[in-house]
């Protein structure tokens, strides 16, 4: 799953046999759709492996020991609306306008650096992922560590964050920055 990395981080594609990504994550386009890219090694495995159970049509990439080429030549598994397609085309034009993948990677890295600098100056916050080498530039998750917040139990913290996020959205500052539901109460940028 390259959703969090593609267009935002250097990826060694020679080591990746199958790559999937959504149009939403880094590109900011429609969330319901995505893409798949496969290597020649993956094609070989698809054409030689016979699964012991039936594969649902939606997930079938090979039939009768042959790659189903249509989906890699412009066919679709599930038809997206043309508005969604235009949305991702606009997103790709933006990537091209900022210097291609190198430009979008640079922007992603710079955004992470801005957050790192801000957190370094604000002792009330910390990254959920404390190891800088493992920290993602596309799913930056921040914890509030000040006592006014940590004195609440988890439910109370989530309530405080819900009010905060509502205010930020109302003021036009941020949208959809709530941490993942199974993560500790957090801010996800």
Question: Language-model features: where?
Answer:
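Catalytic PLP-binding core of fold-type I/II PLP enzymes
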Residues: 1-13
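Conserved active-site segment immediately N-terminal to the catalytic lysine
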Residues: 12-24, 34
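Short, solvent-exposed loop/turn segments at the edges of secondary structure
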Residues: 14-15, 29-31, 135, 184
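Active-site C-terminal subdomain of aminotransferase-like
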Residues: 24-116
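Glycine-rich, charged/polar anion/phosphate-binding loops
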Residues: 20-23, 72-75, 123-127
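Conserved C-terminal alpha-helix-loop-beta "cap" of PLP-dependent enzymes
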Residues: 120, 124-188
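General beta-strand structural signal in soluble alpha/beta enzymes
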Residues: 1-2, 19-22, 175-177
């Amino acid at each position: 799953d390259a959703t969090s990395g593609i267009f935002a981080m250097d990826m060694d594609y020679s080591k990746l046999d199958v790559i999937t990504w959504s149009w939403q994550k880094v590109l900011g386009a429609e969330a319901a759709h995505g893409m798949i890219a496969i290597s020649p090694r993956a094609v070989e495995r698809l054409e030689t492996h016979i699964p012991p159970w039936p594969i649902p049509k939606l997930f079938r990439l090979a039939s009768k020991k042959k790659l189903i080429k249509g989906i890699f030549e412009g066919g679709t598994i599930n038809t997206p609306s043309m508005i969604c397609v235009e949305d991702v085309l606009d997103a790709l034009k933006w990537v091209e306008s900022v210097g291609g993948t190198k430009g979008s990677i640079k922007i992603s890295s710079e955004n992470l650096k801005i957050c790192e600098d801000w957190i370094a100056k604000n002792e009330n916050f910390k990254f959920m992922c404390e190891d800088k080498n493992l920290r993602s530039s596309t799913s930056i998750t921040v914890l509030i560590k000040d006592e006014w917040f940590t004195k609440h139990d988890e439910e109370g913290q989530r309530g405080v964050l819900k009010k905060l996020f509502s205010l930020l959205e109302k003021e036009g500052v941020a949208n959809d920055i709530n941490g993942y539901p199974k993560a500790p109460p957090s801010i996800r940028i």
